[in-house]
Amino acid sequence: MAAAVAMRSGSGSDGGGGGYDKAGMDSGKYVRYTPEQVEALERVYAECPKPSSSRRQQLLRDCPILANIEPKQIKVWFQNRRCRDKQRKEASRLQAVNRKLTAMNKLLMEENERLQKQVSQLVHENAYMKQQLQNPSLGNDTSCESNVTTPQNPLRDASNPSGLLTIAEETLTEFLSKATGTAVDWVPMPGMKPGPDSFGIVAVSHGCRGVAARACGLVNLEPTKIVEILKDRPSWFRDCRSLEVFTMFPAGNGGTIELVYMQMYAPTTLVPARDFWTLRYTTTMEDGSLVVCERSLSGSGGGPSTASAQQFVRAEMLPSGYLVRPCEGGGSIVHIVDHLDLEAWSVPEVLRPLYESSRVVAQKMTTAALRHIRQIAQETSGEVVYALGRQPAVLRTFSQRLSRGFNDAISGFNDDGWSVMGGDGIEDVIIACNAKKVRNTSTSANAFVTPGGVICAKASMLLQSVPPAVLVRFLREHRSEWADYNFDAYSASSLKTSSCSLPGLRPMRFSGSQIIMPLAHTVENEEILEVVRLEGQALTHDDGLMSRDIHLLQLCTGIDEKSMGSCFQLVSAPIDELFPDDAPLISSGFRVIPLDMKTDGTPAGRTLDLASSLEVGSTAQPTGDASMDDCNLRSVLTIAFQFPYEMHLQDSVATMARQYVRSIVSSVQRVSMAISPSRSGLNAGQKIISGFPEAPTLARWICQSYQFHLGVELLRQADDAGEALLKMLWDYEDAILCCSFKEKPVFTFANEMGLNMLETSLVALQDLSLDKIFDEAGRKALYNEIPKLMEQGYVYLPGGVCLSGMGRHVSFEQAVAWKVLGEDNNVHCLAFCFVNWSFV
C-alpha cells in the first residue's frame, strides 16, 4: 500500500519519489521534494538501492536538507524509486522484444512469400511435365525454367577490371536469388524451428549442384559491424587456415572488388585440405542493405602457385555471401548463404559424406557465422560475464588458438615446418616433426623455448555404433581411463624450463583427482572453454612428496546432450597456473566427425559408467528406431598429440609419442565398445552376424558343447537359459572366442574378456582370422592339434603368446578349444577359451 501511495506521489516534477509533509499526514495532502533533496537521495540510491532502516536513519542525520522528512517517507521514496527502475527496465525489455517480434514477423513474411513463389514455380513445372508426358511430341518449352540461369565461365572476363565488375554483378544477382528467391530448392534443416527465441531459420539445399546452406536471423549489431566480422572468416570459421586478399579496387558504384585466396584445414588425416580462389564483391543496396557476395574465379586453376598449394585440392565456391539489412530501432536481419563444390571425388568413398552433405556445411559454416555474430552481440551488450575477470575477446582468442593448433597438427602443412618421419613398419600412427615451432621472439605465442621442436603423433580410425557426443563426454570426464599423467607432466614441464626430460626420469603419480573450472561457453553451449587441474605428486627422493599439479586449458565442442553438430572435439594444452594472456599453447586431443548425419540427437541420459554400460539388457539401452540409428552410426575419429623435444632426443621422443598414441587408441577402442548402444551385440533377438543364430542360442550351444566334450560345466549355473546364460558367458573371467568352421576361420563372437584381449569390437571382430592372432610357433602348435580336435571334439593347448588385433603380444596360461554343435549335432563353429591372459 505504501508503494502504491508513493507511486501516486511520484507524479510530480521532482522525478524521484514523493512524501507527505508533517502537517499533511492526517489531511492526506501531498508535498514535493526539492531538487536538492532529490539529488541527495539519488546519490544514496546509486550506492545502495535498498538501504536498511539504520542506513536510512544515518542518512537523515548526515543530510540536514532531509531533516524535515520522516523515516517512513524515506522508506516510501526508496520503494517508489525501485519500482520506477523496475518499470523502466521492464518497459525497455518489452520494447526490445517487440522490435525483435516485428523483425521476426517481417522475416517470416518474406520467407512465406519466397515459399509461395517456390510453390507456384513447382506447380508450373509439374503442369509442364504432365503435358510433356501426355504429348511427348511437343517441343521443348523453356517457359517454366528458373529465371536465374547459370552464368558463363567467369574466366572469360577475369583478365580485366571491367570483366571482373561484370562477374561481380552476376554474382550479386545469383546470390540474392538464393538468399531471398527460389534459385535453390531450400528445405528446412531438421531440428531447427523458427520463433522469437529461436536461433534463426536454417535451410539446406535439395537436388542442386554441390552442397548449400542458408540461414537468416536477427542480430543486435549494426550492419557495418556485422559485415566487418563476417569478412574476417578465420576469426569464426575454425576450418579456415588463412584468407589473403591479393587485389582490391573500387567497383565504381561505391562497392569494392577483392581477389581472395583462402585455405581450409583437412578435417582428418585421411583426406587432403581444400583451397579457394575467389572474387569477393562488397556493395550497398538502394534500401541501405549491405551485401558481400563471393564466387570462385575458376574450379582448378588461378590463384597463387606456391609450393604449399600442392597439398590442397582446389574446391569451388558457387555464388555465396551475406545480406545484412538494418532494422528499425537497431539491430539487423542477416541472410547467409554458403554454396560449395568440395570435389568429393578426391576422398575415400567412406568419407565422402563429409563433402556431400549440405547439413555439414550448414553446421560448420553457415550457422557458425550466425552464432559468432550473435555471441559478439551478447558480449557487446554486457549480457555475458566470464570467470576470472577475463575479457570475452581474450577467452575467444584462447579458443581459436587451441583449435588452430590442433588443426595445424592434423593437417601438417609443409610451409608450417612439418615433415613426416619414418615409421616402425606399422603405419597405424603418423609421426611428424616441426623444427620451426620454436620461440625465437616474444610474439610467437604458440612456440616453445626449446632447442629442438615439436613431435606430433596422430592417427585416424573409423568407429561403428559409437555416439560421438557420448564418447567425447566420457573422454572429458574420465581422463584417467586413457591418459598417462607422466606425459601430461612432460609437456607441462616444457612451459617452465628450456629442457624436455623424457617421462620416467622424473616419475609422477596421478592422484586421480581432476578439477574442471569453466571459463566461457558459446551462446548455445556448442563450445566450452575450461581449465582442468590434475592433482599429482612427485615420487623421487630429491623432490620428496611435493605437489605436482598440472593445469590444462581445454576446449570441448559438441558435448551438450542436445548438440546436433557435425564435429565433436576435446582439445587441450598444458598451461601455466598463472594463465597469462600470451601463454604458449601446444594442442592435443580428439576429434569425432559423424559420417551418417542423423535427424535426431543422441538419447539423453546415456550412462558413462563402464561397468553399468556393459549390463546386458540394461534399462538405459535405447530401443526402437533410435537404437537402430545408433547401432548404424559411423564416424571417423582423429587423434593428435604433440610433444616438445630437444634435438638429441628427437628419436626417443618420436618412439615415446608413437607408443603413447597407440595406447590411447587401444583405450578409446575399449571405451567405445562399452558405450556403444550395440555394445555387447547380445540383445535378445539380435543376430550376431548374418546367417548365424541369435546370441542366447549360441551361448547355450557353447556351454552344452563344452559339457558334452569335456564332461564338466563351463559355467556354474549352466542350467539357466536365455539372456541369463548369455550374461554369465559375457561376464566370464576368461576370454572366450568363436570362429567359423571353414577353410580360413574368422572370428564371429567373443565375450567381454575376449574383445578386450583382441583389442577390438564385435563389429571389427569379423575382420580378424584365427591365423592372425598366432605367431608362427603358435600356428604350428595349433595345426598339430587339429586332428585330435576333430577326433575327440576338444583339445588343450599349452600356454604361450598370441597377438591382439592391434598387434600387441598377449600371454596366456592355457587354452582349450572345442567343437560347438548346433541343434542338428553338426559342427557349427569352433570355440576357444584363453585362461589367465595378460598383455606382455
From Swiss-Prot:
Subcellular location: Nucleus
Biased composition (Gly residues): 12-21
Parts forming coiled coils: 86-135
PROSITE patterns: HOMEOBOX_2, START
Function description: Probable transcription factor.
UniProt similarity note: Belongs to the HD-ZIP homeobox family. Class III subfamily.
Name of protein: Homeobox-leucine zipper protein HOX9
Source organism of this protein record: Oryza sativa subsp. japonica (Rice)
Lineage: Eukaryota, Viridiplantae, Streptophyta, Embryophyta, Tracheophyta
